[in-house]
Structure formats: structure tokens, C-alpha cells
């Protein structure tokens, strides 16, 4: 009986060790897969669609375009999203703070409006992987790793008060110096700013975007997709 009991205990111990090793291996594999997935997500955009005549800094294309005061119609995003070879497309709307009493942020700082429903540029870099409350509210802002400090968690930007709901990990790109907010909030403060009145003489900010960031499908050639975009989207470059 003692031998049988000892044999059973040994068998149980071996089985436990085997299960433990398997579970540990699976955890390591899952961790590696999550790391690879996050790395893929953080690669940013393959193509940046800008209005013709706007210059883009190639070193910034993967993450965030340089802000320019020229625009594309908002429906360009839908057109681009439907082009063969496009996996994801998300719009951005640029504005900026000014060195005036309407802005508590020190210095002139890039402000980029994003659509969190389609965004794949900012989300993967969020500290903690998510926003406070799980969404980007109309009065919420996300700070790049090197954006100007916000006193008390809130800032006045072009006359409107915003609250910090998230921060980004360092990217080594212009994203680090950028303040992000909801795309419609960015349009609203830009439209109401007396410092930007001349920009909107011929453009409706609520029907405008600054660029479309594009990620191509696996196996698709970015150059071919870019050529198709230029062909199908008048005024794009």
C-alpha cells in the first residue's frame, strides 16, 4: 500500500510539474504575442494623406504630421478608407495654442484633433493602455510625453477649458510635444478663435480635416495604395 501511495504521489507531482511548466510556457507565449501585437500597433501609419501643396516631414509620417493651415474635405476619410489595400484610416485636425491670455499652456504648442473611434496612432501609446473613464470626452486632452506641463490637471486652450484624461509614453517623435483632443473639440476652438479668423474665410472647419493617416493591409504595397489614393482623391498629395 505504501509503495502504491508513493507511486501515486510521484505521479501526481509529475503531473503538477508538467501542468505548471505548460501554463508558464503559455503565459510566456501570450506575453510575447502581446508584445509583438503592441509593437505592430505602435508602428503608426504607412501613408499620410495631405492636401496638395502641404509639405510633410518624412521623419514624422509614422506618427503625426506637421500642422499646416491647409485642409481637405472631411469626407476624404471615407473615400480613403474604401480604397483597395487600406486596412485603417483615421483623420486628424490641426490647430495650436498661442502666446495669449486665452491659453494657459506655455508657448505655442501643437494641438491635434483625433477621432478615437478610428484612431490607431495615439491609442497604442497611452500610459496604462487606456483613458480615464475609457473614452475621450469633448473637454478631455491627452498629453504627449514632453508636452508643456498642465497645472492642476486642466488647461485653457484658445479660450476653452480642458482636463487631462491621459498621457502618452515617449515616442521619440513630434507626438511627444503634442496635445491631443477630440476632433470636433479641436474644430470648435479653432473656429471660435479670433487668432484664426482668416483661416476660415474660405473653409468650414467642421467639414475639414488636416490629414488622413493610413495603415495598409498586410501584403499590400504602400506605394501602390498611395498612388490609388492620389488618383481617387482630388487635391490629395
Locate each region found by the language model.
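Short acidic/His/Gly/Ser-rich catalytic and metal-binding motifs that mark active-site loops
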Residues: 55-59, 120, 217
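Hydrophobic, regular-secondary-structure patches
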Residues: 20, 24-108, 136, 227-231, ...
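Short, flexible, solvent-exposed loop/turn segments with mixed acidic/basic and small polar residues
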Residues: 11, 130-132, 199-205
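A conserved hydrophobic position in a structured secondary element of the catalytic/binding core
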Residues: 50-51, 72, 114, 143, ...
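Hydrophobic secondary-structure segments that place a key small or acidic residue at a functional site
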Residues: 92-95, 104-117, 121-198
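N-terminal Sec/SRP start-transfer signal
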Residues: 1-23
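Mechanotransmission and gating elements of multispan inner-membrane complexes involved in transport
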Residues: 167-237
Amino acid at each position: 500500500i505504501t509503495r502504491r501511495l508513493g507511486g501515486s504521489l510521484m505521479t501526481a507531482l509529475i503531473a503538477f510539474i508538467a501542468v505548471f511548466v505548460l501554463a508558464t510556457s503559455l503565459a510566456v507565449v501570450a506575453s510575447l504575442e502581446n508584445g509583438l501585437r503592441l509593437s505592430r500597433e505602435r508602428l503608426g501609419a504607412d501613408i499620410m494623406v495631405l492636401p496638395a501643396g502641404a509639405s510633410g516631414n518624412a521623419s514624422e509620417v509614422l506618427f503625426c504630421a506637421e500642422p499646416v493651415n491647409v485642409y481637405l474635405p472631411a469626407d476624404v476619410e471615407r473615400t480613403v478608407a474604401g480604397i483597395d489595400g487600406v486596412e485603417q484610416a483615421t483623420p486628424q485636425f490641426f490647430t495650436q495654442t498661442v502666446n495669449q491670455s486665452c491659453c494657459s499652456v506655455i508657448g505655442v504648442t501643437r494641438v491635434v484633433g483625433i477621432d478615437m473611434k478610428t484612431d490607431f496612432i495615439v491609442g497604442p501609446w497611452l500610459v496604462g493602455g487606456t483613458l480615464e473613464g475609457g473614452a475621450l470626452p469633448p473637454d478631455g486632452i491627452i498629453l504627449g510625453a514632453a508636452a508643456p506641463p498642465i497645472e492642476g490637471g486642466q488647461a485653457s486652450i484658445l479660450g476653452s477649458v480642458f482636463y487631462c484624461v491621459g498621457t502618452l509614453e515617449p515616442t521619440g517623435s513630434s507626438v511627444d510635444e503634442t496635445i491631443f483632443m477630440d476632433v470636433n473639440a479641436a474644430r470648435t476652438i479653432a473656429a471660435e478663435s479670433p487668432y484664426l479668423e482668416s483661416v476660415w474665410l474660405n473653409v468650414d472647419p467642421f467639414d475639414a480635416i488636416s490629414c488622413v493617416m493610413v495603415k495598409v493591409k498586410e501584403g499590400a504595397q504602400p506605394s501602390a495604395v498611395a498612388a490609388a489614393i492620389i488618383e481617387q482623391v482630388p487635391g490629395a498629395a
